[in-house]
Amino acid sequence: GTARRHSDPEADRAVRVALANDPKEQSENVMIVDLVRNDLSRHAAKGSVHVEELFGVYSFRNLHQLISTVSAELREGHSSIAALRDCFPMGSMTGAPKIRAMELIEACENRKRGLYSGAIGYFAPEGDFDFNVVIRSIQYNAVNRLVSYTAGSAITARAEADREYDECLLKAESMRLAVGSRQ
């Protein structure tokens, strides 16, 4: 869930509360959390998968974002690389059911996602790792001299096309301004 910030503090607080309590945004977030819990459980120690935060509202310069955090301890004998690999593609980028959603993405999108919806991070020598899904990032192709960025939203049974499109524009706004585009 994403919502535009307001310059008026009272209106901004109201937007935060509305985002945190929006049933559609909550159901999308729960779907993603369930996918992450399922993916992590394949390599997690028994009972170690925890939802540390559900429906946290984080405020950024121009938007509020609904964020949840899931963690797990790696099961003995399982590698962190295998655990990470088996989380891909990320449910937050595909939706559910994951396999069918990927088939629809392949059929509907006219180009590969490339780095967008992939991950960047690190593995530490002691086995810890931290990765972040690549969203709202600007990419530059030196060969084609092309700057690009991508934004997306969730298509669910309760989704309204105009609202989802507006959410994409909001998510892309900072990138658009960073590259100097007016449109």
What residue spans do the PLM features occupy?
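Extended alpha-helical targeting/anchoring segments
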Residues: 1-183
